[in-house]
Amino acid sequence: MAGEMSILGSAILALFLAGYLGQQYLPPPKPKVIGIDLGTTFCSVGVFHPGLGEVEVIGDLQGRKSIPSVVSFTVSGIHSGYEGQDLADANPLNTIYDAKRFIGKLFTPEDLERESTPYQFQVLHRNGSAEFSISTNRTFTVTPEYISSRLLLNMKKMAEGHLGVLISKAVISVPADFDERQRNYTVRAANLAGLEVLRVINEPTAAAMAYGLHKVDVLNVLVVDLGGGTLDVSLLNKQGGMFLTRAMAGNNKLGGQDFNQRLLQHVFTRVHEQYGALPSHEGDIHTLRQAVEAAKLNLTFGQTSVIRVPLSLRGSAGSVVYEDVLTRQLFEDLNADLFQKILTPIEEVLREGRLDKSEVDEIVLVGGSTRIPRIRQIIAQYFGMEPNTSVDPELAVVTGVALQAGIMGGSWPLQVSAIEIPNRHLRKTNFL
């Protein structure tokens, strides 16, 4: 009997040893679940690598990790991401963006007309929902969830190409104030893209996870999410490992695109002052827009940025090469009033949450526009403390979603999950 027990014990020890050696020396399994940040202006996809315990945000073939949430329809096909964005100026009526503003929402005809005013593409009212009119070699309509499905399919294919495996499951983030219908339509979009959604997680919670706040002792977390087109400020209350979104406010018409537009308008004015004419070709306008966007990014890290763009101008001016030096101070002056608007929803969530600003334990920055030095300075001066900048703000949400995807996929080493407490009374207070 003792011999049999000894043999059994040796067998169990051998199994444990084999498992340990397997973990140490065999390649870890491929991730099975992807995490997707389906943003208003940009999308990102990430995975949690088993064994390594690391999140990887996947880039496209050019290494870009933030992909435009744009879909353009042409006679030759459907173009998503950067391909779609590149067609926006030449094909404005059939290039759809900001679909997230419409997905799952019910509108009166009057509300939809107001919401669709800024867009060149046509938005139709169908039984309370929005649809987009497309006219290529035929005329048809598409839904916001179809547009979202094309973006999600693009993320899915990027992940599959990078990992070398087929992907069928995902965790997706949504704004904390999305109601049940908006969440269901987002899941429907994922299903159209061939993805089973294991969990829908709130964007502020995902960001808090990326910063590791689900594992540390903090109570009140303020999340400032300033992306390309929207500002969302959320006040999270952490109770153990559980997050409750206590209050939310923002501005659905404020973001990096608005800052770009101010700078672009300044450049147009300078061109007109210098040459007495404006660019005439859509391609030139697109190139100038790209140059201004690049300059804005450069001014995040430096004090000056040079733009040099060949232009074809209307009238007798003809072809010229426009060159100018843009400064950070100029950029800040042009957008001073917009930057100050960020404080309004911050003050509102503190009021709704019945919290003094001194009671905020952690300030988390999300969205590429929070990289702008003046914006960080305004927030720091208001609170008298520096915001947490340990994570790339543009990738904070997708990092948190990928962590949750790893948890849902049973990846090891085991991670601490974030549990969300539903707040059925949560309503986002919008400012303009």
Explain the meaning of each model-derived region.
Residues Q122-N127, S133:
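An exposure/low-complexity boundary signal
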Residues A2-R114, Q122-L124, R138-T141, E145, ...:
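Oxyanion-binding/catalytic loops of NTP- or PPi-dependent enzymes
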Residues S80, A130-S135:
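Generic recognition of long tandem-repeat/solenoid scaffolds
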